[in-house]
A protein has these predicted regions:
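Extracytoplasmic cell-surface/polysaccharide-interacting catalytic and binding patches
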Residues: 2-3, 7, 20-27, 31, ...
Length: 259
């Protein structure tokens, strides 16, 4: 308890009683230090706690609860005039030593960007580097362009208009239905290679939840989200939403009771 308190994971009384508060503190420590999360201060966790590599607690700020988590999909679209309040150019705020921002015009929500910095710092501490942000905020107009381009490609292959639109919706959101409109969704990649199966993808899927992010489109949730799995697409929902969704194996629709 004393060591957990020193590192900021525990704020209760140091009394030697391993109760619920201590167990939750151990779980939080394990999550933020890359350990198996079981809430038990066994040998591996104990050794980590007293090592030089033990990290101080990282608390990611959560935006206004009235705004988070925001559900955006075909059933809950945003309007053509929707624009997030606090967008920043990621090139201006993301340290190049941690991550490459693919385009100079890529924007994102400021709080989400700060959470990403914390996440990539943790990844670097674990020896995982080479990250790239390929997409962030998209306007309604830009999403319309992407949607129309994909429909045109299918039409060129001989699809009917109806089938081209249906096929497009498996991988490209309708204008207004894309999470990228929020500024809270990002495509994380590795330059020059397929992301799936890389050490970066594996690390991201294990640890992003601890920094307020979720893997938004997963294989076992395709029937609920309406999208094919995208291992590169993360969405900021803030803590504790992200860890609750992970621990309960819920996608955003399920978590908000919309499934």
């Amino acid at each position: 308890q004393q060591r957990l308190k020193e590192l900021g994971y525990y704020d209760g009384e140091v009394d030697g009683d391993f109760g619920g508060g201590t167990e939750e503190a151990v779980r939080l420590y394990q999550r933020q230090n890359g350990l198996d999360v079981d809430g038990i201060a066994a040998e591996k966790t104990f050794a980590s706690l007293y090592s030089d590599n033990a990290r101080q607690v990282t608390i990611t700020p959560t935006p206004d609860p009235a705004q988070m988590p925001l559900l955006v999909n075909r059933e809950h679209p945003v309007g053509a005039d929707y624009e997030p309040d606090d967008l920043v150019k990621l090139k201006n705020v993301m340290p190049s030593s941690l991550v490459t921002v693919k385009g100079s015009d890529i924007e994102g929500d400021r709080t989400a960007a700060n959470a990403m910095i914390e996440m990539f710092e943790a990844a670097k501490a674990d020896g995982v580097t080479g990250w790239q942000i390929s997409a962030g905020y998209r306007s309604y107009e830009y999403q319309q362009e992407l949607f129309d381009e994909q429909v045109a490609e299918y039409r060129a292959e001989g699809f009917t208009q109806e089938k081209a639109v249906s096929a497009t919706r498996n991988t490209v959101a309708d204008p207004g239905a894309s999470e990228h409109h929020t500024g809270l969704a990002f495509d994380i990649t590795v330059a020059g290679t397929i992301f799936k199966g890389t050490e970066q993808q594996i690390w991201l899927h294990k640890h992003c939840w601890d920094y307020g992010f979720i893997i938004r489109y997963q294989e076992d949730k395709e029937d609920i989200t309406g999208f094919l799995a995208e291992c590169w697409h993360i969405r900021y929902v803030g803590l504790p939403h992200s860890t609750e969704m992970r621990d309960r194996n819920l996608c955003l629709e399920e978590y908000l009771g919309e499934a």
